[in-house]
Amino acid sequence: MDPTGIFDLPNTSLIFWEVVTFLILLALLYRYVYPIIRDQIQKRQAQIEQAIEEAEKTRAEARELLEEYRRQIEAARGEARQILDEARRQAKAQRERAREEAREEGDRIIQRAREEISRERDAALREVRREVADMVIMASSRVIGRELDAAEHERLINEALESLEAEVAGGRTA
């Protein structure tokens, strides 16, 4: 056992001076080192806060840009839809015009063909009339044995033509 005390404590004067030295060291650290550390921590905190603010600004700008790009993309899609719709309308109108022109051309061709057929039929009828008239004149000259005058020729021709037209008209309706 130690003669200085019950709990074997070291010399109290030594403890006292250790505590005083520790407090002086703390005071010196607080006075000279702590402000430097505090300033460095505050600077670092300010830098971090500034970086966070800049990151938030950048994020906000990125969101705005993203929204702007989305609006532009949607506008471009709308414009593309309008262009496609207009192209479809124009193609449909062009097809309709082509159909109408083809229909009109077909009608014109049919009309020209009908007119040509009518002209050919009229020419054929005139030719038939002329030949019939010639045959009637020859036949009547032989039957009568004499030449007919112009009025008699005209009368016989008209009778033959009326007979022929009646037969042709009867053939058309049958």
UniProtKB/Swiss-Prot annotation:
PANTHER family tied to this protein: ATP SYNTHASE SUBUNIT B, ATP SYNTHASE SUBUNIT B', CHLOROPLASTIC
Q: Which GO terms describe its molecular function?
A: proton-transporting ATP synthase activity, rotational mechanism; proton-transporting ATPase activity, rotational mechanism
Q: Tell me the domain of life.
A: Bacteria
Name the principal localization, coarsely classed.
membrane
Determine if DNA repair is one of this entry's keywords: no
One GO cellular component, as annotated: plasma membrane
Against HAMAP family, the record matches this protein to: ATP_synth_b_bprime
Work out whether the entry's keyword set contains Ribosomal protein.
Answer: no
Signal peptide start-end: none
The gene name on file is atpF
According to the record's subunit comment, the protein's assembly and interactions are: F-type ATPases have 2 components, F(1) - the catalytic core - and F(0) - the membrane proton channel. F(1) has five subunits: alpha(3), beta(3), gamma(1), delta(1), epsilon(1). F(0) has three main subunits: a(1), b(2) and c(10-14). The alpha and beta chains form an alternating ring which encloses part of the gamma chain. F(1) is attached to F(0) by a central stalk formed by the gamma and epsilon chains, while a peripheral stalk is formed by the delta and b chains.
Bilayer-crossing residues are 9-29
Q: Which organism encodes this protein?
A: Rubrobacter xylanophilus (strain DSM 9941 / JCM 11954 / NBRC 16129 / PRD-1)
Q: Which Pfam families match?
A: ATP-synt_B
Q: Which UniProt keywords apply?
A: ATP synthesis, Cell membrane, CF(0), Hydrogen ion transport, Ion transport, Membrane, Transmembrane, Transmembrane helix, Transport
Question: What NCBIfam families does the record tag this protein with?
Answer: ATP_synt_b (TIGR01144)
Q: Where in the cell is it found?
A: Cell membrane
User: What protein name does the entry list?
Assistant: ATP synthase subunit b
